Amino acid sequence: MQAYHLLLVCMYISCSAYTNASTAEDPNPNTYAEFSRMSHAAKDNGESNRALRTHNPDREERMMSLASLENWHAKLMGKTFEQVNSMFNKGKFNPPKGTTVGQATDWTWSKTIAFFEQMKKDNTTPESLKETLNIAQKEATMSAKALRKDPDYLMYNAFKTFWDNKSPGV
């Protein structure tokens, strides 16, 4: 469930960053010619929200509009954690009643940081964690896609990011 909340936060950040990106001020608008053609093809296709990724219309793929994704996220953030748990039928941990998804995400981050602080006090370094979890071997044998799904690799990356961003005196 912690990973789910982190995914929601990342999704929200990427959606808001995409919304703020403006192609109108780009000094080279020809860069977007291919996207423009694809956009016009979708509009000619009955104003449906589709994009043709291939020349074969049978392999057409539906795309969720950014506005509907942001709308869904806004509705989700207003719900309590119990409501979200019942929606997804997960219920991995149960915070106090009335806790919102944002508060649960903050709680998850605080627990993760506390765990990393304890690892740091136990003299765990990114190098020792990399050796313990055999990360070098995984990097050599696994694809990038497989590494992104490996929990040990994800934990190592999160701990390394934490380690790099914390000042030595903290």
UniProtKB/Swiss-Prot annotation:
Signal peptide: 1-17
Main location: secreted
The keyword Secreted is assigned to this record: yes
Superkingdom of origin organism: Eukaryota
Compartment(s) of residence: Secreted; Host cytoplasm; Host nucleus
Transmembrane feature ranges: none
Induction, per UniProt: Expression is induced during host plant infection.
Keyword entries, A-Z: Host cytoplasm, Host nucleus, Secreted, Signal, Virulence
UniProt keyword Signal, yes or no: yes
Gene Ontology CC: one annotated term: host cell cytoplasm
Placement of sequence motif RxLR-dEER: 50-62
Family designation: Belongs to the RxLR effector family.
Entry note about domains: The RxLR-dEER motif acts to carry the protein into the host cell cytoplasm through binding to cell surface phosphatidylinositol-3-phosphate.
Function description: Effector that enhances P.infestans colonization of Nicotiana benthamiana leaves.
Protein name: RxLR effector protein PITG_07555
Organism ancestry: Eukaryota, Sar, Stramenopiles, Oomycota, Peronosporales
